[in-house]
Amino acid sequence: MCAKKLKYAAGDDFVRYATPKEAMEETRREFEKEKQRQQQIKVTQAQTPNTRVHSAPIPLQTQYNKNRAENGHHSYGSPQSYSPRHTKTPVDPRYNVIAQKPAGRPIPPAPTHYNNLNTSAQRIASSPPPLIHNQAVPAQLLKKVAPASFDSREDVRDMQVATQLFHNHDVKGKNRLTAEELQNLLQNDDNSHFCISSVDALINLFGASRFGTVNQAEFIALYKRVKSWRKVYVDNDINGSLTISVSEFHNSLQELGYLIPFEVSEKTFDQYAEFINRNGTGKELKFDKFVEALVWLMRLTKLFRKFDTNQEGIATIQYKDFIDATLYLGRFLPH
C-alpha cells in the first residue's frame, strides 16, 4: 500500500499507512536510501576535479623566484611562504560534516544539555571552514548535504539508545516488552512512572505485531516519538513546574501543528489533567498524561483524514461509517 501524506491546517502531518508495521518498514527503507545517497555524494566529491586551480593566482614563492631570475639575482633566501587564510565564517555544527574522525571510535552519545550544543557551536564557529583535499568546501554543498547527514547521525544514535534500553528492560528475554516492563522504563520528570493508561495507549498505537506488547522495532519507533514530544513538553513548561497548565498545553498543540481553537484544547486538557498540587487552583498535566492526550489526538486526526476525501479539512461521512468510527474510537477513550 502506498503511503499518502496529507497537508492539513490541523494535525501533525501524520503519514497514513495500513498498519504501524508498514510505517516502520517505510522508515527503515527511507533510512537505507538516505545512507546510500550520502555514500554516493562522498564518492562524487572525491572524483570531481578541482576547477578552481585554473583560476588560482601564482603562489608567492614561485613568482618571487621568477622575478629575481629575470632580473639576474641569485636566490640566497626565500621570503616567508605564502599561506592562504580563510575567513572565519560561523559554521553550524550540524553542517560541519566534512571533518574526518579516527577509524574505530564509537559514535559519541547524544548531548543531554543545550549548553553543550551551544559550546560546541561556539568552538566550531571560531575555526576556518572545512576542507576537502586542501580546498575550501563550497557553501552550497554544506547546505545541501549537511542537514540530512546530521539527521541520519542523530537517528542512528536514537536507535542505539533505544536498542540498549529495550534489552535492559527485556527481563524475560523474549524480545518483547510487556506493559509492566514498559511502565518501568518510562518516567515523568518527577521520577514517577507512567500511569498504566498512558502505557496502554502507546502499546495500542505502536504494538502492531502482537496485542499487549511491543517488539524492538516497535519500541524504537515509540522511543523516537516520545522523545520528540518530550522536547515540546519541556519547551512549553515555562515556569519549570514539571507539569503544564491549560495555556501551556494549548501552546504545545500549536507547536505540534494542531491548529485548533483554545476551547477545543481546553476540553481535551480537562479529559486528562488532574489536581496534582494541593495548593494549586487548577488542573495540571504530567508528561504521561500529555503523551496519552497526543495519542488520542493522533487517532482522531487519522480517522478524520479517512473521510476528508478532498483534503480540505472537511469530512463527509455516512451514517453507517459514523457509527463504525465511533465504536472504533470508543475502544481508546481516556480512562
Swiss-Prot record:
Gene of this entry: PEF1
Function: Calcium-binding protein that is required for polar bud growth and cell wall abscission. Can also bind zinc ions.
UniProt: Ca(2+) 2 binding residues: 237, 239, 241, 243, 248
Annotated Gene Ontology cellular component terms: cellular bud neck; cellular bud tip; cytoplasm; cytosol; nucleus; site of polarized growth
Effect of residue 218 to A: Induces EGTA and SDS sensitivity
Keywords: Calcium, Cytoplasm, Metal-binding, Nucleus, Repeat
Record protein name field: Peflin
PROSITE patterns tied to this protein: EF_HAND_2 (PS50222)
GO BP of this protein: axial cellular bud site selection; bipolar cellular bud site selection; regulation of COPII vesicle coating
Main location class: cytoplasm
InterPro entries: EF-hand-dom_pair, EF_hand_dom, Peflin/Sorcin_CaBP
Location of the EF-hand domain: 144-192, 198-223, 224-259, 260-300, 301-332
Protein location: Cytoplasm; Nucleus; Bud tip; Bud neck
Any one Pfam family match given in the protein's UniProt record, by short name: EF-hand_7
Species: Saccharomyces cerevisiae (strain ATCC 204508 / S288c) (Baker's yeast)
Biased composition (Polar residues): 43-53
